[in-house]
């Protein structure tokens, strides 16, 4: 039986990493074989692209950034996601295509039609079985990012106007059939209970 592809997406500070761990534990308790991955990244080539895209030492043009991320996605999809799904493994990804529309589309201002055209080339009709889009008020997200212990990457250093546009993009994407809006402003357990409801429908 084919595995399921689940994505967690949302603005910086939305708590995706903690929820991915909770999702994996839940699915494993229900007898599922699970792997986790991330975008950009997930492959050797993808991780190299991730370093380029997130490094504060580079300032790529918006379209360059988009094409790099999509190149990483093609490699990721063909060599990791699709083979594991075919083998019956459930794949949990930290970000996928909703992030591209939110960050490069709404955030950078790239025409959404361009993104859609490129998406169809790379993904054809492939979409996640479930995309949980974690949304929270901008001031809470900014505080969480500020309190992170590690050095901030290039995206985390963007201004508040950029993140407001990204949040707008995520709210729009959360209305699509494959996506579910998740209120990420509460504690980890309350957020997971929302996600759990949608997971149970996939089992």
Swiss-Prot record:
One of its GO terms (biological process) is dUDP biosynthetic process. Gene3D superfamilies: P-loop containing nucleotide triphosphate hydrolases. Pfam families: Thymidylate_kin. GO terms for cellular component: cytosol. Its EC number is 2.7.4.9. Keywords: ATP-binding, Kinase, Nucleotide biosynthesis, Nucleotide-binding, Transferase. It catalyses: dTMP + ATP = dTDP + ADP. This is Thymidylate kinase.
